[in-house]
A protein has these predicted regions:
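Active-site diphosphate/adenylate-binding microenvironment
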Residues: 1-66
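Thiamine diphosphate
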Residues: 39-204
């Protein structure tokens, strides 16, 4: 597969890479769980030690936002970026109240594909795209951010991305960047359940 897919729609990987480059690979990366977690591990670069906070394989959706708040207090000298999917963000959405109260300067990047992406990928690959309980009904995240007095920007196209990231980084305090990415993007390669490395799948 392509290292960095570049179809008509934004991909999760290119958003992650763009944020990494804009922060000169020096930010602390916090991940939630799902495709966003794997894309972050794949496309975010580091120039310093102790630069990633993740729950690994525990599957704790909703981990990212509160962990990022903690990281801003633990390392106030560094930029903290958290990547989340729309499913994970809605599991701990109330933490925006903590960010507002504490003025925690978390840079939140929402990779919104309107799906529980990781589960959808499995349903696509192993269940003939019979999507069950994976499509997401999302609220207007710009209105939610406004309600919490958090600056926010929604990006729909590749041309808008760099400017929005620069705005996020330049903002003194928290910021929510919603990137509307391709709905059926996949994280490849992957090993099928019970399979070995030599059975690795390269495409969906």
């Amino acid at each position: 597969p392509e290292l960095l897919p570049a179809g008509k729609e934004l991909s999760e990987g290119e958003v992650v890479r763009a944020v990494s480059e804009a922060t000169h690979n020096g930010a602390i990366l916090v991940t939630d769980v799902g495709q966003n977690q794997m894309m972050s591990a794949r496309y975010f670069k580091y120039s310093k030690e102790r630069s990633i906070v993740t729950s690994g394989g525990l599957g704790t959706m909703g981990f990212g936002l509160p962990a990022a708040i903690g990281a801003t207090f633990g390392r106030p000298d560094r930029t903290v970026c958290v990547f989340m999917g729309d499913g994970g963000l809605q599991m701990n959405l109330q933490e925006l109240g903590t960010i507002m109260e504490q003025k925690a300067p978390v840079k939140m990047i929402l990779l919104n594909n309107n799906f529980l992406g990781n589960v959808r990928q499995w349903q696509a690959m192993f269940f003939n795209r019979r999507y069950s309980f994976t499509p997401m009904m999302n609220p207007d995240y710009m209105k939610i951010a406004s309600a919490y007095d958090i600056p926010a920007r929604r990006v729909m196209t590749r041309e808008e991305l760099a400017k929005a990231i620069d705005e996020m980084i330049a903002t003194d305090g928290p910021f929510l960047l919603e990137a509307c990415v391709e709905e059926e993007g996949n994280v490849m390669p992957m090993t099928p359940p019970g399979g070995s490395v030599n059975q690795m799948l390269l495409e969906c």
